């Protein structure tokens, strides 16, 4: 944990129309996160945005209806991350439940196939008898793949949420809330959310066509797959706007009630998470990394198989396999992070200031882990980072992570415009992107990326800061308030879990688990004694027995151990006073 340069409190925002019976603390927290009206607190499915607002969805459902009616062989082509895995599993399960007996799936291998619907992946789908291809969480930039599919006589339905380029692939139908002419109010749907909306629309069309009645089957309850929607949404770190909070809350509720896929249950077991107390953060920090480990180090088909399987015994075997991959991923990441920090420290020792944007490369880095590495270095140095690893044939694959104030994909697009041929290909979002380039061009890219970011970004944004919700009163430092905050979510990207600040007397401090600081503190003005823990501290600084008072940025939490529940604080940052 690296102390930030400054602590900033959120500006107070006046609620407009929040319920009168809402506690003042929650009103303040919600209003500062853009929730100012009662309807923004909706968590039931009736509050979901209607699927009819997604452009192209009618054409897409007609394609699928005709495919079902004609028993067309559908191959769902996914992606090798958690969003792609949940999108793939949800689509296959939903199509089967809707009466499609001729559907299978294909997930590109990160190392052999690369990202998206490439011509090579189309050939694999063709070999599996594809008469129609449906992409999930990819496809919006797959011009060559779509053209190749058409050359083979295979129609293509693209469902994606990534930002489109200047031109769209010539797919037979495209659903993407980020299309320029799409009126869908939420631009933050994950790939699994887009797939879920398509299945809802298809069910409506099938019902209207008499599909279920003619076969003597009941229309399926697609809400059964909201556990997958929640997992993919949180793991993909898309903003939790009102619509995504509804999807996530509904999925969490199903998991807590024990109504989840065996694969998710097995992941919860291996991660030692109690379904009854599951929070959105558990999906992002416990389940998501294990699922992602398959795509990072091996093949995401293992992850999809886990989500598809109906047998808890089989699910536990696959979950153990994913857990082992995740442990290996952690070890690889630890070594890569040490090497990356050495590169940064070498630059600092040379007297140079770090550029506004960091591009880093090491010939022994693992291309499946560079995204996590970029995220870690970004958090430490608070600037956009792209980490590269060798991809073979003299090329590099990079993964970038950005900060507020720099749109990563727009930055890459600008570089591509200014310096054609610098990159082989690129794509992504505001906060994350992927790209590839020739190894011989890395030094040039490193310089140009650093210069562009320095030119584009406000230097003040390169200073790390912690954004706090202010102080808690002593009367608010209770188990009841901690439980209220836990229940008030789901918290996540762009809707952060409440973080408070305050000054405390430091009464006890010791290191546990090698790098975690366990403390006991008391508010300086008096109040309850609080147990706290700060994860991954700098052990060259802490513990410091000379420090008697500290300023903390912390979350109020409940520690549950052997049936006992006690109040504790999770310390994000600590400053000696």
Predicted regions and their residues:
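Hydrophobic helix-and-loop "lid/oligomerization" segment in the mid-to-C-terminal part
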Residues: 2, 8-132, 152-153, 207-441, ...
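Mid-to-C-terminal polyanion-binding domains and interfaces
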Residues: 69-70, 314-320, 324-360, 393, ...
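Short alpha-helices
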Residues: 90, 170-213, 226-229, 428
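Conserved acidic residues
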Residues: 131, 172, 551
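Histidine/acidic-residue-rich, glycine-tolerant segments that coordinate divalent metal ions
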Residues: 136-192
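A short acidic, amphipathic alpha-helical/loop segment
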Residues: 144-148, 373, 480, 484
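Histidine-centered active-site/metal-ligand motif
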Residues: 161-162, 366, 429, 516
């Amino acid at each position: 944990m690296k102390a930030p340069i400054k602590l900033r409190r959120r500006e107070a925002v006046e609620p407009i129309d929040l319920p009168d019976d809402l506690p003042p603390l929650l009103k303040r927290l919600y209003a500062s996160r853009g929730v100012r009206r009662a309807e923004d607190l909706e968590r039931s499915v009736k509050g979901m945005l209607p699927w009819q607002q997604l452009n192209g969805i009618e054409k897409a459902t007609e394609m699928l209806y005709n495919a079902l009616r004609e028993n067309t062989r559908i191959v769902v082509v996914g992606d090798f991350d958690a969003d792609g895995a949940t999108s793939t599993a949800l689509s296959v399960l939903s199509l089967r439940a809707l009466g499609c007996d001729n559907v299978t799936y294909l997930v590109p291998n990160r190392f052999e196939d690369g990202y998206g619907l490439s011509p090579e992946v189309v050939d694999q789908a063709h070999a599996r008898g594809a008469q129609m291809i449906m992409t999930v969480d990819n496809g919006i930039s797959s011009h060559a793949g779509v053209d190749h599919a058409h050359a083979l006589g295979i129609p293509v339905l693209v469902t994606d949420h990534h930002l489109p380029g200047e031109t769209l692939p010539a797919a037979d139908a495209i659903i993407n809330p980020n299309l320029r002419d799409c009126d869908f109010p939420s631009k933050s749907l994950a790939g699994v959310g887009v797939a879920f909306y398509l299945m809802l629309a298809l069910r409506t069309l099938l019902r209207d066509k008499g599909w279920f009645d003619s076969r003597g089957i009941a229309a399926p309850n697609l809400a059964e797959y909201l556990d997958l929607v929640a997992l993919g949404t949180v793991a993909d770190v898309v903003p939790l706007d009102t619509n995504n909070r509804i999807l996530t809350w509904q999925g969490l509720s199903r998991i807590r009630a024990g109504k989840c896929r065996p694969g998710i249950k097995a992941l919860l077991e291996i991660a030692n998470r109690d379904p009854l107390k599951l929070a959105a953060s558990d999906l992002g920090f416990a389940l998501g990394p294990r699922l992602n480990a398959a795509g990072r180090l091996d093949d995401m088909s293992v992850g999809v198989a886990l989500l598809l399987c109906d047998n808890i015994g089989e699910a536990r075997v696959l979950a153990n396999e994913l857990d082992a991959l995740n442990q290996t991923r952690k070890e690889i990441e630890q070594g890569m992070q040490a090497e990356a920090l050495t590169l940064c420290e070498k630059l600092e020792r040379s007297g140079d200031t770090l550029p506004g944007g960091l591009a880093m490369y090491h010939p022994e880095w693992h291309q499946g882990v560079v995204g996590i590495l970029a995220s870690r270095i970004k958090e430490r140095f608070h600037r956009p980072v792209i980490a590269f690893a060798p991809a073979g044939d003299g090329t590099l694959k990079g993964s970038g992570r950005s900060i507020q104030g720099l749109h990563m994909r727009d930055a890459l697009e600008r570089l591509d415009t200014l310096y054609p041929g610098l990159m082989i290909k690129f794509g992504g979002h505001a906060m994350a992107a992927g790209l590839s380039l020739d190894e011989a061009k890395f030094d040039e890219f490193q310089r140009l990326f650093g210069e562009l970011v320095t030119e584009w970004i406000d230097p003040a944004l390169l200073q790390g800061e912690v954004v706090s919700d202010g102080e808690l009163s002593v009367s608010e430092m209770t188990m009841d308030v901690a439980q209220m905050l836990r229940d008030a979510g789901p918290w996540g990207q762009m809707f952060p879990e409440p973080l408070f600040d305050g000054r405390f007397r430091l009464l006890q401090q010791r290191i546990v688990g090698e790098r975690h600081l366990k403390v006991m503190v008391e508010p300086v003005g008096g109040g309850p004694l609080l147990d706290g823990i700060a994860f991954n501290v700098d052990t060259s600084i802490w513990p410091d027995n000379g420090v008697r008072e500290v300023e903390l940025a912390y979350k109020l939490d409940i520690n549950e151990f052997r049936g006992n529940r006690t109040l504790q604080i999770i310390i994000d940052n600590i400053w000696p006073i």
